[in-house]
């Protein structure tokens, strides 16, 4: 079956999902929404047969899609997702699900009310080597986990700077700036929680906000956690780091230490043994 899909937010994330859907064959792009003409034009070039426009509710009525991909500014995810559910559409939401616990609950309530499917697009679960590291830890290849660490180290200056071709104004909007702990830190947090599969019982955090001049929110976070199974964890998130090696979409993501070994950078290491590179299960 091929699902009719409307892309709500035609920036990089939305275009990537549209590309994957099209290549996979189980989705066809029938609608494109974005209030920014340049973004809409880029998507139209790839999907010329799709109905495009800057009125989201009107497009929902016109296109009547099976699925809506919500990939616009983070603070709009809740309203746009709920509107799609109320129009009878399943929803795939670019991470984060929402930017407040109240908005997250509103989405959950709308899903339960409509009975439709809602999923957050946590891509790291499907990417080598982090998926393979998580599966190896779940299989107890390193024994009992006592410490788990995740990182999102991403120089986002090109997205914050008006002089950059990658400038994304909503990220530095003074009223609704992107919370990088939610918008980027959700990658390591999600893969950590999936890997360890134990509830968090305690959490503590520090943050600062001076590494990105003019950014209207904190840009560096350290989060420390204790899990129900007595393991401890740490998350480091920064969007103000400086250097060419940090310009990819987040670095680090995961390290897992167990009583019988360690998983780090796609390798399984045990005392007195040569490290083994994990096999890519998607290859």
Model-assigned labels for residue ranges:
Residues 1-47:
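N-terminal Rossmann-like dinucleotide-binding module
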Residues 11, 17, 50-110:
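Beta-loop-alpha module in the N-terminal Rossmann-like domain of NAD(P)-dependent dehydrogenases
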Residues 27, 281-283:
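C-terminal helical cap and adjacent loop that interface with cofactors, partners, or active-site loops
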Residues 70, 93-94, 99, 118-120, ...:
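Hydrophobic residues in well-ordered beta-strands that form the structural core
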Residues 105-124, 143-147:
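Rossmann-fold dehydrogenase core element
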Residues 124-215:
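Predominantly a Rossmann-like dinucleotide-binding segment in NAD(P)-dependent oxidoreductases
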Residues 183, 189-272:
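Contiguous beta-strand/loop segments that form the cofactor/metal-binding neighborhood of enzyme cores
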